[in-house]
Amino acid sequence: MSYHSFSLEPKYENTMLSQRFKEIDKLFSTLSGKKIISDSVPPYDILQLKENFYKLIVSVPGYLEKNLEISTQYDQLIIIGKKEITENTNEKKETVEKILHQEIYTGDFSLSFRLNERISVMSATLDQGLLTIYFEYQIPEKQKIQKIQINVK
């Protein structure tokens, strides 16, 4: 299971240092023949729609609604994808002798996001290989800005 903290703070991962770690990870996976850890997790984006509304988009090409499960428990959002290898999606089955290059992940995956107690999951949609989950960040009345009218006498 891959665990991510869902925060409304921007996350800066595209730094020179993080790129170096990714390159080192790829180098060791090439030498050892083992799969890169980050390759078993589908890519995702977190976008702000309005002041208190957000959406999480997870790239899940080839997964059907029946292959995906979304749940919340305590302060976690859990997304599980299970894809049967023998599943025929109207494509002609071919025998593959050797995979020369593979970037499209097609196996099982699990993503977990820690949710702030004020974040509520509103809905989820699956459209053209993109799983979109909508969130609302609820601000308590006491913390909202209250404008006080000034009366002139």
Swiss-Prot record:
Pfam families with a match to the protein in the record: HSP20
Keyword check for Oxidoreductase: no
Taxonomic superkingdom: Bacteria
Keyword annotations of the record: Plasmid, Stress response
Residue intervals of the sHSP domain: 35-153
Family: Belongs to the small heat shock protein (HSP20) family.
Protein name per UniProt: Small heat shock protein ibp
Organism whose genome encodes this protein: Buchnera aphidicola subsp. Thelaxes suberi
